[in-house]
């Protein structure tokens, strides 16, 4: 069980969006490398990064900022946003990423995801971003008719390292994770699921370590961390204690 701090990149800066709207961006740190190092110093063991401009452009836009992050932290980094080809994946893994997140291309070309898992085993995750129960693509700008579980099941047995499931209706507004939908997805597939969107407070962390939620690989936190609604040391201690209890059972 992992708590992933999030760095969302827009125009080279760390921002948070409200409900996925690029016009509602709050800048939290103009220096992504410094933010990555700060999260490492707080005790986090992973980092979740999204190239927001890239998600809309269909190609990497904030490459220099991601490189700065990779240089600043020793922690493994997963990146989503604008990664659409096998060459993109190979390039980013060569530059030091641990895991790439494929979102739009997972809807448009599932076969590419399956091929990527074969070529880069253990390094490919799928991002499922949903609005109103349906999968959204192109930086959340377009809705599809595809259901969340329907898409996830396409990748059963393919070797996908994780599914990052984001509830767009809750993202960046601190209303709490959509636990019902997230756990339903986790029950439906054998692929590890990471919860994203809406993590609001220590209540979500306490919910995350309850027995039925321990099937998740973890959860992603953005605004709640930046706004000080989650105490990193307390959150990480809760997770560590839950892991120890699980091992002891």
Swiss-Prot record:
SUPFAM superfamilies (UniProt xref): Ribulose-phoshate binding barrel
Annotated CDD domains: HisA
Extent of the signal sequence: none
A single GO BP: L-histidine biosynthetic process
The entry's keywords: Amino-acid biosynthesis, Cytoplasm, Histidine biosynthesis, Isomerase
Matches recorded under Pfam families: His_biosynth
GO molecular function, one term: 1-(5-phosphoribosyl)-5-[(5-phosphoribosylamino)methylideneamino]imidazole-4-carboxamide isomerase activity
UniProt main location, coarse: cytoplasm
Catalytic activity: 1-(5-phospho-beta-D-ribosyl)-5-[(5-phospho-beta-D-ribosylamino)methylideneamino]imidazole-4-carboxamide = 5-[(5-phospho-1-deoxy-D-ribulos-1-ylimino)methylamino]-1-(5-phospho-beta-D-ribosyl)imidazole-4-carboxamide
Subcellular location: Cytoplasm
Transmembrane residue ranges: none
Pathway noted in the entry: Amino-acid biosynthesis; L-histidine biosynthesis; L-histidine from 5-phospho-alpha-D-ribose 1-diphosphate: step 4/9
Enzyme class, UniProt record, top EC level: isomerase
The protein's Enzyme Commission number: 5.3.1.16
Active site: 8, 129
Family in the record: Belongs to the HisA/HisF family.
NCBIfam families in alphabetical order: 1-(5-phosphoribosyl)-5-[(5-phosphoribosylamino)methylideneamino]imidazole-4-carboxamide isomerase (TIGR00007)
Protein name, UniProt field: 1-(5-phosphoribosyl)-5-[(5-phosphoribosylamino)methylideneamino] imidazole-4-carboxamide isomerase
Organism: Rhizobium rhizogenes (strain K84 / ATCC BAA-868)
Underlying gene: hisA
